[in-house]
Amino acid sequence: MALADSTRGLPNGGGGGGGSGSSSSSAEPPLFPDIVELNVGGQVYVTRRCTVVSVPDSLLWRMFTQQQPQELARDSKGRFFLDRDGFLFRYILDYLRDLQLVLPDYFPERSRLQREAEYFELPELVRRLGAPQQPGPGPPPSRRGVHKEGSLGDELLPLGYSEPEQQEGASAGAPSPTLELASRSPSGGAAGPLLTPSQSLDGSRRSGYITIGYRGSYTIGRDAQADAKFRRVARITVCGKTSLAKEVFGDTLNESRDPDRPPERYTSRYYLKFNFLEQAFDKLSESGFHMVACSSTGTCAFASSTDQSEDKIWTSYTEYVFCRE
């Protein structure tokens, strides 16, 4: 009977130790998988668990070392969910991989990224984002046509300009030889300062193109004189660089069809929250844009192919191209 008891792993039997060990191991919390899927604000990231726990005492480190998987929020597909900025999280994840901060030359979301780093409790990343930017090797920031602090609101340095050293006895009003060299063309003739594609002549606004389009309908025939048959515009679309479109149209720009588009990328899926072409023209004009081209196509639909006396319903698609130099 004692042998039978030990075989069954009773507390007083010889197999009790094995049964107790099995019970304790089953009581341990389940481990996280080596490959972790994260849903951050609708953006899905797949990474290794060792990456997200690479910074001790951070928010992600506590989530994936001090908590159990069932305690964390998940989406409908079982991915761990974080209600944060999905676009900026890519830079957080890049930092966690090798603890290095690498940002694009033109990055207007620096302050928002610093706020995300504070949320994820990454003090070293917060410190680096808050420190003044130091010019790296290669061309100076002014030759790359970027902002002083990587922000939309900061002043652009004219291309070819560098801070001249104040020479002893030099007049404060004397022209800088650096500026004189920057204003000359390679052939020796006088020329304006060289510009990057995103910098305008006044050094404060970026150049570029914006195309707005709309699909409209109107009637030609007996009802053409009625007020109800005037131009009808269903939606005004906006195509161009994301940062330019946001600068011109601001809160009147609907980004729902192309969210989290980086500022340096282009899009053709934005549209305006209003339907008045002249309002769009006014906003473009106030921002320094002028029209350089337009095109239109139209089709006609008959109510009956045999009865030509019926009113003709026309639909058209029109695009206007605006430029700021």
Curated annotation (Swiss-Prot):
Residue positions where Phosphothreonine is found in the record: 196
Listed Gly residues bias regions: 11-21
Tissues showing expression: Present in a variety of fetal organs, with highest expression levels in the cochlea and brain and, in stark contrast, is detected only at extremely low levels in adult organs, such as brain and lung.
MF-aspect GO terms: identical protein binding; RNA binding
Keyword 4Fe-4S: no
Region annotated Disordered, chain positions: 1-28, 129-202
Phosphoserine PTM positions: 151, 171, 185, 200
Self-association state and partner proteins as the record states: Interacts as a tetramer with GABBR1 and GABBR2.
Localization per record: Presynaptic cell membrane; Postsynaptic cell membrane
Recorded name of the encoding gene: KCTD12
Described function: Auxiliary subunit of GABA-B receptors that determine the pharmacology and kinetics of the receptor response. Increases agonist potency and markedly alter the G-protein signaling of the receptors by accelerating onset and promoting desensitization.
UniProt modified residues of type N-acetylalanine: 2
Lineage top rank: taxon: Eukaryota
SMART domains: BTB
Name under which the protein is recorded: BTB/POZ domain-containing protein KCTD12
GO CC terms, sorted: cell projection; postsynaptic membrane; presynaptic membrane; receptor complex
Record GO biological process: protein homooligomerization; regulation of G protein-coupled receptor signaling pathway
Residues with PTM Phosphotyrosine: 119
Disulfide cysteine pairs (residue numbers): none
Annotated keywords: Acetylation, Cell membrane, Cell projection, Membrane, Phosphoprotein, Postsynaptic cell membrane, Synapse
Main location: membrane
